[in-house]
From Swiss-Prot:
The lineage of its organism: Bacteria, Bacillati, Actinomycetota, Actinomycetes, Mycobacteriales. GO terms for biological process: DNA-templated DNA replication. Its EC number is 2.7.7.7. Belongs to the DNA polymerase HolA subunit family. InterPro entries: DNA_pol3_clamp-load_cplx_C, DNA_pol3_delta-like_C, DNA_polIII_delta, P-loop_NTPase. It catalyses: DNA(n) + a 2'-deoxyribonucleoside 5'-triphosphate = DNA(n+1) + diphosphate. It comes from Mycobacterium tuberculosis (strain ATCC 25618 / H37Rv). This is Probable DNA polymerase III subunit delta.
Length: 322
């Protein structure tokens, strides 16, 4: 255990990544100790005092090695932060201290202090961008020894949404269910009940000018009771993406970096935008803005409002590019 890094800073507030980082530190420390029976103490960082922390970090008669995990360190008060800094500067041999810190909060400087002390940093920043979620999906599949293409990543994002924990679970389940043969068709097959799949399918048909196809897909989704707000949001996202990408030209990878989108999203929008003009995009944006209010209660018949908006958006480009 003496070779293990004694001080660890789990930095960020993406819960799944934080849990994994702490678990990795514990697993590594136990492996180095050669036993799973290493005492682990957990405590909120803001609740520690000098005496309590010294006691937690001190080897006992029964075990020379021990691990202390201090959570929510960003919210620790000034006194608690000082106690943690002091303890981290002089850890007893055989002790591992793990400090979980969001990176902000009133004890923001504590993270910088621990970093300057040589703490091993485990980045766990919240995953907020679509491109970051796409990278997370690829990483999850790679850890399961499965390689997926962009279409598969897109399908999974559309099917599962933005929750990182659900995305991780979906990746694991897909690999188990398909024996590793994961593609876009498999994603749609296993997640066919998700509203987002139908929402984006309807939106894609609408912005492609497929009036009949969009209307039919919408009726089917509504018959199954899909939330109107989700379907409306998918249409709005498709229109706004075309509005952002349409005026741009050039390499989709360069544009992706500029616009904060994944390259596959830019490439898809570039193809869709060929049907659209500045005026039709402006009209579509007005339609989806009105729809957003309508499906949230601005009109009595939200079903009709959604059907009308989908049809009107599709009709804007129904005769272009054919």
């Amino acid at each position: 255990m003496s070779e293990a890094k004694p001080l660890h800073l789990v930095l960020g507030d993406e819960e799944l990544l934080v849990e994994r980082a702490v678990a990795d530190v514990l697993r590594s420390a136990r492996q180095r100790a050669g036993t799973a029976d290493v005492p682990v103490s957990r405590m909120r960082a803001g609740d520690v005092g000098a005496y309590e922390l010294a006691e937690l970090l001190s080897p006992s008669l029964f075990a020379e090695e021990r691990i202390v995990v201090l959570g929510a360190a960003a919210e620790a008060g000034k006194d608690a932060a000082a106690v943690i800094e002091s303890a981290a500067a002089d850890l007893p041999a055989g002790t591992v201290l793990v400090v979980v810190h969001s990176g902000g909060g009133r004890a923001k400087s504590l993270a910088n202090q621990l970093r300057s002390m040589g703490a091993q940093v485990h980045p766990c920043a919240r995953i907020t961008k679509v491109s970051e979620r796409a990278d997370f999906i690829r990483s999850e599949f790679a850890s399961l020894r499965v390689k997926v293409d962009d279409e598969t990543v897109t399908a999974l994002l559309d099917a599962v949404g933005s929750d990182v924990r659900e995305l991780a679970s979906a990746c694991s389940q897909l690999v188990a269910d398909t024996g590793g043969a994961v593609d876009a068709a498999a994603v749609r097959r296993y997640h066919s009940g998700k509203a987002e799949v139908r929402g984006f399918d309807i939106a894609d048909k609408a912005v492609a000018g497929d009036v009949a196809g969009a209307a039919e897909a919408l009726r089917w989704a509504m018959m199954r009771g899909e939330p109107l707000v989700v379907l409306a949001d998918a249409l709005a996202e498709a229109v706004h993406t075309i509005g952002r990408v349409g005026p741009q030209s050039g390499d989709p990878y360069r544009l992706a970096a500029q616009l904060g989108m994944p390259p596959w999203r830019v490439q898809k929008a570039q193809k869709q935008a060929r049907r659209w003009s500045r005026d039709t995009v402006a009209t579509a944006m007005r339609l989806v803005a009105e729809l957003n209010a309508n499906v949230k209660g601005a009109v009595a018949d939200a079903d009709y409002a959604l059907e009308s908006a989908v049809r009107q958006v599709a009709e804007l480009v129904a005769d272009r590019g054919r």
